[in-house]
Amino acid sequence: MITTTGLTKVYRSRGREVTALDGVDLHVREGEVYGVIGQSGAGKSSLIRCVNLLERPTSGTVTVAGQDLTALAGRGPRAGKELRTARSHIGMVFQHFNLLSSRTVQDNVELPLEILGVSGRERGRKALELLDLVGLTDKAKAYPAQLSGGQKQRVGIARALAGDPKVLLSDEATSALDPETTRSILQLLRDLNRQLGLTVLLITHEMNVVKSICDSAALMEKGRIVESGTVSELLGTPGSELASALFPVTGDASGDDRTVVDVTFHGEAATQPVISQLSRTYNIDISILGAAIDTVGGLQVGRMRIELPGRYEDNVVPIGFLREQGLQIDVVDKSDQESVLVKEGAK
């Protein structure tokens, strides 16, 4: 549904050049919720603004619903009209609500339809339908100043859906909201994704957002995507930075003659008592140093850091047993004080 190829964006100011996007390749499948995560300055917002050509890429291509938007970004009037038509099928929700304070909630939702030349009666019908969809039917005649932050964002979402988009872009839509309101907005986005078949591309710096609703995710650093895939694929990738960030675990070995192992489990393996089976099978005492578990995409997933007695060479067979159960295993290198992962699972 969304594909970028070799996407580059260079900003020029006062003789200086800043590369915000450096050859970004991204593929978002139809009907999925895709999260792009990264620190401030990683290039996330530049990426999402290039997807609908609010920012014109320096080079590379952007394809949405099979249409090459970069090919429509010419300078002539015809190119501009075609690009506007293509953009009408892409909704966008911003961090700041950008509601017109002098208009009622219903009038704010009607604004895109008004610009498209839709008749007044049809605009009103559509706006009320969308307000019902986001749970704000009773606020149709209210003004933005009378709404909470979460309600304002719901109006922003309804407005973004006015043109019946196939794609919804969300740029840090929950970062200004409290945790409870954030959860309700994320649930709304997931519900809309399922009810309307929307493809959702969201930008965030919060791991909880990815855990809550994303089917796939990508990690951005310095204008590049350094890791991407479905959440389940990432959890099964040895040494995955995203998996470690989604489910962080800590804990150091109690002695030099101990082996510390990070165990990642998801799907059916997450419901099996594999640690107790390991202890009974090999008659060894196992210490649990830390654990993180949650439900992602309806599946129970998590990571656990355990300590086994003896050095690594003494634990090759027990570690092999864990792998046979379908678990991802990363052996933690004790020689590094920061517990750098040895990508043992890649062997």
Curated annotation (Swiss-Prot):
One of its GO terms (cellular component) is plasma membrane. SMART domains: AAA (SM00382), NIL (SM00930). Its main location: membrane. ATP binds at residues 38-45. It comes from the Bacteria. It is an enzyme of class 7 (translocase). The keyword Methyltransferase does not apply. It holds the Pfam family ABC_tran. Residues 2-247 form the ABC transporter domain. It catalyses: L-methionine(out) + ATP + H2O = L-methionine(in) + ADP + phosphate + H(+); D-methionine(out) + ATP + H2O = D-methionine(in) + ADP + phosphate + H(+). Keywords: Amino-acid transport, ATP-binding, Cell membrane, Membrane, Nucleotide-binding, Translocase, Transport. Its EC number is 7.4.2.11. One of its GO terms (molecular function) is ABC-type D-methionine transporter activity. Belongs to the ABC transporter superfamily. Methionine importer (TC 3.A.1.24) family. PANTHER family: AMINO ACID IMPORT ATP-BINDING PROTEIN, METHIONINE IMPORT ATP-BINDING PROTEIN METN. This is Methionine import ATP-binding protein MetN. The lineage of its organism: Bacteria, Bacillati, Actinomycetota, Actinomycetes, Kitasatosporales. The gene is metN.
